[in-house]
Amino acid sequence: LKSLGIEFDLFSEEQRLYENGAIDNVLKRLEELSLSYKKDGATWFKTTSLGKEEDKVLVKSTGEPTYRLPDIAYHIDKVHRGFDLIVDIFGADHIDTYPDVLLGLEALGIKTDHIKVIIHQFVTLKKGDEVVKMSTRKANFITLDDLVDQLGVDVVRYFFIMRGANS
């Protein structure tokens, strides 16, 4: 991102949320509020108590958290650090999870009116007339650095700003 002139003042790693107890604190608070329960070896977020049609998994039976849990903890961290505007840019694969994150924050007494969410569609790349199929699981992807190296900063910037996040 730095090659595009985008810099971060602070980069936070998810692991820190586990090490400092933030993840466990979210689970504990939800349990205290009777908003979580165990079923089939998984920990569930009782979103039906908050008006949703079905409950959502926070921790899978394998012990692996879903996106919801660390995202709730991370947003609590951001709020406690005093940010008056939080802008989340998620890929289209997070469209079903971010409403649960906001719901979790609200259930824990945190206002969400200063959190703005942008869902960005995936970028489609073509080689000639063919669409290049991307898959991080199959290690078939092109990094932003690769694009900048192949096309140049100005071309990459142009193509990203010529379309909206929803296209």
What positions do the PLM features span?
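Conserved alpha/beta enzyme-core scaffolds, especially Rossmann-like or related mixed alpha/beta domains
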Residues: L1-R29, Y37-D40, K78-G91, D113-Q121
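A general marker of short, structured functional hotspots
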Residues: E7, E14, D71, H94, ...
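Generic, ordered loop/turn and secondary-structure boundary motif
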Residues: E7-D9, Y18-E19, K46, L58-V59, ...
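A glycine-rich phosphate-binding loop feature that marks nucleotide/adenosyl-phosphate handling sites
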Residues: E14-N20, T43-L50, I118-K126, R163-N166
